[in-house]
Swiss-Prot record:
Keyword Lipid metabolism applies: no
GO MF term set: lyase activity; nickel cation binding
Keyword Hydrolase (UniProt): no
Cited InterPro entries: Ni_insertion (IPR002822)
UniProt keyword terms in alphabetical order: Nickel
Record protein name field: Putative nickel insertion protein
PANTHER family, alphabetized: NICKEL INSERTION PROTEIN-RELATED, PYRIDINIUM-3,5-BISTHIOCARBOXYLIC ACID MONONUCLEOTIDE NICKEL INSERTION PROTEIN
Stated family: Belongs to the LarC family.
Short name of one Pfam family: Ni_insertion
Source organism superkingdom: Bacteria
Length: 426
C-alpha cells in the first residue's frame, strides 16, 4: 500500500498552515527545530505550536517567532538572502535526501516566479531578511514533515501529494512595493506556471501566500478532486485570522492501492534522488588542443561528467558549449579549473536533481585478468530487477594493452564471465 496525502484548501494555503497540518499529524516540533537549526538560523527564530479555535473547530497553529535581538543587530545592515545563498544553506545542512531535494525545488520555483514578476534572473531575487527566515522555516519545515510522515515518492522523486483547487481571495494587501491586488503577482505567476485550477469563495482577503503557493505548485502531483484513498488521519493547520468559514488547511493522510505498479511505496525501491551542480560556459576562442587537458583537470578535481556541444555564437562564429556536472561540494574547484584553463569570462551555475539507480561493482576473473563489472538495478530482493551490466572501460583497456589483444575481446569475456556466475548461483 502506498502512503499518499491530499491537501484540502477551503480558505487557501500558507507555509505556516502547512506546518500546522504536519504537527497536527504527529511531526514533532523538536524534530523540525533540530533539523532547521542545521541551516544556521537557530539564533533568528523560534518555532512553537499551539491548539486554537477557528469558528468552533480546533486546529494546530504554528508560529515562527523572529527573535528581536537578531533583528535589531542587523536592521541597519540591510541584509538579505538571495537564492544561491539559500540553496547553499540547504545543501550544507545535512537534511534527509528527499527533504533536501524538495526544499531546493520549492525555493527554485518561488525564485523563478518572483524573478518573472520583477524582470530579473531567479538568482537575483532578494528575499528580505525577515521574509527569508519565515520562508526558509516554512518551506524546509514542510519538506521535512512530509518526509517524516513517510509519504511515498513517484518516479521523479516527488511526494504522492494531491491538492484541491485554490480559492483566489480578493481585495488588496500591503507589501514591500506598496498596496497590491490579491492574488499577489507571485501567486498568479505560480498558478500560471503550473496551470492550477482556481475559484472564488467570496472572501476578499489574501488566502494564498507566495510561500504556500510555491510549496503546492512544486510538490503536488495533481490538482482537483481527491484520489482514491483510504483516509487514516487528518491534520488540521490553522490560519492566522478568523474568516466566515473555518480558516483551516486540512491534510488527509491515507493509503492507496490503485496507483501504477511502477510507483513504489517507499523511497528505498525507487532510484535515489540526489542533488548535483551544473556549470555551463560558451567558448569560441580556445585552442581545441586544450579541451582534452581541461577534461583531465576537471575529472581530477571530482567532476562527475564533462561534455561539449557544437554551437553557433554571435557574429556567426562556431563555438562549443562546455558543460560540467559535479557534486555541490566540488563546484568551486571545477569552476576554478574552468577560469584557469579556458578563455571563458563567465560561468552559469544551476542546481538540479537527478535520479540514480542503485549500483555495485563485482570483480570477474577472465583468463587475462580481473575486470570489474558495474551492475545497476531497481527494486529490492526478491523483486530486484537488474537494468544495466557494463564492464569497466579502464579495466578492459589495461588488459587489452597488456596482452595486445582487441579491447572488445576483453569486454566480451568479462560479460560472459558475469553471465556464467549468475547461472551458477541459481
Amino acid at each position: 500500500m502506498n502512503k499518499i496525502a491530499y491537501l484540502q484548501c477551503p480558505t487557501g494555503i500558507s507555509g505556516d498552515m502547512c506546518l500546522g497540518t504536519l504537527v497536527s499529524l504527529g511531526v514533532p516540533v523538536a524534530y523540525l527545530t533540530e533539523k532547521l537549526n542545521n541551516l544556521g538560523i537557530a539564533e533568528e527564530y523560534k518555532l512553537r505550536a499551539e491548539k486554537v479555535q477557528r469558528n468552533g473547530q480546533e486546529a494546530t497553529k504554528v508560529h515562527v517567532d523572529l527573535l528581536d535581538h537578531h533583528h535589531h543587530d542587523h536592521e541597519h545592515h540591510h541584509h538579505g538572502r538571495h537564492l544561491p545563498e539559500i540553496e547553499q544553506m540547504i545543501l550544507q545542512a545535512g537534511l534527509p535526501p528527499r527533504a533536501e531535494a524538495w526544499s531546493l525545488a520549492v525555493f527554485r520555483q518561488l525564485a523563478v516566479a518572483e524573478g518573472s514578476v520583477h524582470g530579473i534572473a531567479p538568482e537575483k531575487v532578494h528575499f528580505h531578511e525577515v521574509g527569508a527566515v519565515d520562508a526558509i522555516v516554512d518551506i524546509v519545515g514542510t519538506c521535512l514533515g512530509l518526509d517524516w510522515l513517510g509519504i511515498a515518492s513517484d518516479n521523479a522523486g516527488f511526494p504522492l501529494l494531491y491538492c484541491s483547487a485554490f480559492p483566489t481571495g480578493g481585495g488588496t494587501v500591503r507589501a514591500a512595493h506598496g498596496q497590491m491586488a490579491v492574488p499577489v503577482p507571485a501567486v498568479l505567476k505560480l498558478w500560471e506556471m503550473r496551470g492550477c485550477p482556481v475559484y472564488s469563495n467570496g472572501i476578499d482577503r489574501e488566502l494564498v501566500t507566495p510561500t504556500g503557493a510555491a510549496i503546492a505548485t512544486t510538490l503536488v502531483k495533481e490538482f482537483g478532486a481527491p484520489p482514491p484513498m483510504t483516509i487514516k488521519q487528518v491534520g488540521l493547520g490553522a490560519g492566522t485570522i478568523n474568516l466566515p468559514i473555518p480558516n483551516i488547511l486540512r491534510l488527509w493522510l491515507g493509503e492507496s492501492a490503485n496507483l501504477q505498479a511502477n510507483i513504489t511505496d517507499s523511497a528505498a525501491n525507487s532510484p535515489t534522488l540526489e542533488t548535483i551542480s551544473v556549470l555551463e560556459t560558451q567558448i569560441d576562442d580556445l585552442n581545441p588542443q586544450a579541451i582534452g587537458y581541461v577534461f583531465e583537470q576537471l575529472f581530477a578535481v571530482g567532476a562527475l561528467d564533462v561534455f561539449t556541444q557544437p554551437i553557433g555564437m554571435k557574429k556567426s562564429r562556431p563555438g562549443i558549449l562546455l558543460t560540467v556536472i559535479c557534486h555541490p561540494e566540488t563546484l568551486n574547484d571545477c569552476e576554478a579549473v574552468l577560469f584557469c584553463e579556458t578563455t571563458t569570462l563567465g560561468i552559469r551555475r544551476t542546481t538540479q536533481q537527478r535520479a540514480v539507480l542503485q549500483r555495485e561493482f563485482k570483480p570477474i576473473q577472465t583468463k587475462y585478468g580481473t575486470v570489474r563489472i558495474k551492475i545497476a538495478w531497481h527494486g529490492q530482493s526478491p523483486e530486484k530487477v537488474i537494468t544495466n551490466v557494463q564492464p569497466e572501460y579502464e579495466d578492459c583497456a589495461e588488459l587489452a594493452r597488456k596482452h595486445k589483444i582487441p579491447w572488445r575481446e576483453i569486454q566480451q569475456l568479462a560479460l560472459q564471465g558475469w553471465y556464467e556466475s549468475i547461472q551458477n548461483s541459481k
